[in-house]
């Protein structure tokens, strides 16, 4: 499926990628591989622009460990802060993807009844 994406997307280091149901991180690792190995992106830039959401806590922790191990092949830097920020345990429908934070029901409903 990733082969259907225009090569220009993979080359552009400023493009972000999101796996909204990342499971064990297979797609995340494939994205990072494509960015770093196949397109020579800076590893820190590549991981900084890659995001994932997983609902199950154990699977989420497992995915983060796999991502850390994969990234250790390309950098010695401690990526804990980036990985903890970019790969979250949440319900995708309760996550504000634009602001990368949990949705706040109060904010979501503000102004809803004003025009009623």
Predicted regions: what is each one?
Residues 2-116:
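SAM-dependent methyltransferase catalytic region
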